[in-house]
Amino acid sequence: MVKFSKQFEGQLVPEWKDAFVDYWQLKKDIKRLQAAEAEAAGVAATTPLSQCQAPVAAAHWVMRLPFLHPHGHHHKEHGAIQVHRKLASGGGGGGGAVAGEVYETELVDGGAGFADGEAARAFFARLDEQLNKVNRFYERKEAEFVERGESLRRQLQILAELRAAVVAEQQRDGRRRRCGNGGDSSPPDTEDPSVSCSILHGDQSLRGTSEQEQEGQEKLTKDMIARSPDEGDDDQLTIPQELGDSGRLGRPREEAANTRPRTTLPGGRAVTCQGRSVRINIPVTTPTRTVTAIRELLFDDMLSQSRRSGSANGTKCGDKLSINKRKVHQAEKMIRGALIELYKGLGYLKTYRSLNMMAFVKILKKFDKVTAKEAQSIYLKVVESSYFNVSDKVIRLMDDVDELFVRHFAEGDKRKAMKYLKPNQREESHTTTFFIGLFTGGFAALFIGYCIMAHIAGMYTQQSNKVYMATSYPVLSMFSLFFLHLFLYGCNIFMWRKTRINYTFIFEFTPTKELKYRDVFLICTTSMTIVIGVMFAHLTLIVKGYSSCAVQAIPGALLLVFLLILVCPFNILYRSCRYHFLTVIRNIILTPFYKVVMVDFFMADQLCSQVPLLRSLEYLACYYITSSYKTQDYGYCTRVKHFRDLAYAVSFLPYYWRAMQCARRWFDEGDINHIVNLGKYVSAMLAAGTKVAYENDNSAGWLSLVVIVSSLATIYQLYWDFVKDWGLLQFNSKNPWLRNDLILKQKYIYFLSMGLNLILRLAWLQTVIHPNIGSLDSRVTLFILAALEVIRRGHWNFYRLENEHLNNAGKFRAVKVVPLPFHEVEED
């Protein structure tokens, strides 16, 4: 049977761990009480009883005999504690649960009935503290979610009105076209069917907007790291205009407008439609939206100039804004994503309530068992009547969100709605584990055979077959580096899950489509078995003297097959994961035009450790595209100048992409740390460039430049690794030279990890000292050093996400903050 402490830790929301009942500390307090009770019992047993004490003690022990209590419970003293309820402001508490109440427990008779009265007082003081903490957190989160629910209800109302206006405009456009075809002199409207609304300019749209509201909305926009799920524009949803008449989600729009001011986003355009002034804000996350935003900005400038000139001439200028169906659909997806996140947060809060209630029950039961006092029934009545347990707002709000989502985003289909609101986790199959073992054995056997044959043929020595090492070996090394990296990612997933690091939330993975660590291991073992099998067969043909074009093309064909599998459109071989990978790569390549999220710059960091792989890929593409494999002219791609210059570009690209991501994040968030981080990647680009230049010109000048630039870049990178990415080396931390919060219990592991990262960061020294391992070919030595860099990156990944997870936990951030598209404004 699983202990409750394990069950509690496994089910709590990781980012809210500090807000849960500190069950483990309360258990320590009970152990101190237990030790005091045992000590008191030992003293009582060794003390001789007086004549007057003996009958009382005898009666006491007789009453504790099991057969006198048919239910097996010892006699417990009643009324050991009294719990006082009062308002936080100091006023007295009422009979029911009131938000802002605090609880304080008093021991009857000053704790004289306990073996250690001080320990008992400390226990109940901590228990009161935990109950008050749970109530405060629950109240705060509940209010936050209720306010979010009210905002979403108003968003849906605005969306319904805009959709109705779009439909009405389409109908009017159709009638105009029919009239035009029937001989009407007015020209038909050739623009995209849209709703025309008057523009409310910035000087007219804001009235009395407080500075605090603007800062809050700016923070909401900056904290948003989530993107709406990509869907086609054909997914049109029907939303009736009479929304929310029967729902309980929030107050009516008029009442809400009268009781709290409307917030607006700084900038953007406001439109007046259906008697409502609305500012529309679609986040600029893609190149298309970037171009659209620039176009609208220029259009605004022209309209402003036209408006000023019209006012000067005494004429009235009617400004119009076209809100097409595409923009309405984008707003619809944003609202749907916000509803999903709200439902998820409400589910977390529901779990928070049930787990904390169970923790109070368990800990009080332990207390009664240790002290033989009847405190559980008294204190549990207080817990059961406290705010976090009696408030039903979360349950009602979940029902409302469920109802709204089913009605407006699932066409009335409850099952379809639950696929979004409560996605089922994929069950892990034992078949996957079986095939992992099967392919691991196959890979081991083939790899041993390949190594034996390569050793006999002397392929990897300095006097080896130059053609094979220049053309075929890069294919094997490239696959090895890639799948080694993927294997380490599987190890990262295993460790993140074991330590309860919520990587799926950090990376914004879909729970039903994410790769589990067993899936990653299966992909690695299967792929490497195929690769090593094909390369073993190819090496066998080479050793036997076959050197035709078909034989030389085998490594290239293998690479082509894997590339085709990567882009395969059929729903096989983890298509959703393959396409997500390609999407992330696309976002990295087009970095300045896409909003940068965690998974994008995390993947770009991985590419920075795979520069040898990218250079091998560039060389192989040149070798096979130029048909050099037919003549076995492996030196062609290194002799031609533009291919040689391309090697510089490939060495720079990962660092350039990462630097552009830093620039985009600085542009979006305004944090100067992103500019400092950009400098780190610029130094890495300079170091990579000097290394490539030194490889082409082995002069003392280039060697000196390599040492100087690489040393400075390494110091820069180490500082950023330890202080920024890992959050370590905090001098004022309660854990010296580390940080306040640590997930791993053994502190020495962090110091060992910093030392290992330092050693592996010095791999660039191979450029200077040219190490030779026996008679091995230099390409093999470079592969070993490249593998060490991949291992360093896999090791770095764990601590990078640990720090990110702790940042989320420090802010109690367990759900994404999706920005809302519509912002109501008031006009003068």
Curated annotation (Swiss-Prot):
Protein family per UniProt: Belongs to the SYG1 (TC 2.A.94) family.
UniProt cross-references to PROSITE patterns, sorted A to Z: EXS, SPX
Inducing stimuli: By Pi deficiency in roots and shoots.
Protein's name according to its UniProt entry: Phosphate transporter PHO1-3
GO CC annotation: plasma membrane; trans-Golgi network
Region called Disordered, residue ranges: 169-268
Tissue expression notes: Expressed in roots, leaf blades and flowers.
Keywords (A to Z) from UniProt: Cell membrane, Membrane, Phosphate transport, Transmembrane, Transmembrane helix, Transport
GO BP, sorted A to Z: cellular response to phosphate starvation; phosphate ion transport
Biased composition (Basic and acidic residues): 216-230
CDD domains for this protein: SPX_PHO1_like
Record's bilayer topology term: Multi-pass membrane protein
Keyword Transmembrane helix assigned: yes
Chain ranges of the SPX domain: 2-381
TM stretches of this protein: 434-454, 475-495, 523-543, 553-573, 700-720, 749-769
Single GO term (MF): phosphate transmembrane transporter activity
Domain EXS: start-end pairs: 638-828
Cytoplasmic side: 1-433, 496-522, 574-699, 770-828
Keyword NAD in annotation: no
Location of this chain's protein in the cell: Cell membrane
Extracellular side: 455-474, 544-552, 721-748
Role, per record: May transport inorganic phosphate (Pi).
Primary gene name: PHO1-3
